[in-house]
From Swiss-Prot:
Protein known as: UPF0215 protein MK0057
UniProt family annotation: Belongs to the UPF0215 family.
PANTHER family: UPF0215 PROTEIN MJ1150
Gene3D superfamilies: archaeoglobus fulgidus dsm 4304 superfamily (3.30.2170.10)
Pfam family, one: DUF99
InterPro entries attached to this UniProt entry: Endo_dU (IPR002802)
Cysteine pairs bridged by disulfides in the record: none
Amino acid sequence: MKLREVKPEIRVLGIDDGYYGPEDDRALVVGVVMRGGQWIDGVMSTEVTVDGLDVTDRIAEMVNRSKHRPQLRVILTDGITFAGFNVLDIKKLHEETGLPVISVIKRRPDVASVVSALSNLDRTEERRKIVLRAGPVHSVKTRRDEPPVYFQCAGVEPDVARVVLKRTATRHRLPEPIRVAHFIATGVTKGESSSDA
């Protein structure tokens, strides 16, 4: 699906993971369906392996089996690492769901540091390729008096992704669907949500 027009109530899926402890081998991942950055239409979830390599497949399954799938126009994720270093392949997720994917990061990522940290895990080369495959890092100021957010995207042009991010950042510089997914995921896994996505 080619995203050309970004309506104010564009159906967006925001995804983030919850808390997991050192003894946990699985982590909760929550998706929140919103109309723009205003109304919640639904919630979905899955689990992924801590420091595994299953996040792309698990999120694709979660999206494709959802009753909300026909309405969705774009997927927003909180970065490309979930449950430690379970690295999301945004290009593969785009291919498997047919939806544009925008991975949002609060601070400019240090790709070299991420790649270096991966050397402590199994299947290092596979993880490294996924990180590099995410493509160039872009930026956008979603709120006038706040710092920019950074993003990588698949299946959507950066200029269109910027419009999506501005439309969905209604109360914070991060898109509201990601923030709500974070609140739900941490609230469920910690018993109370943390304030910062």
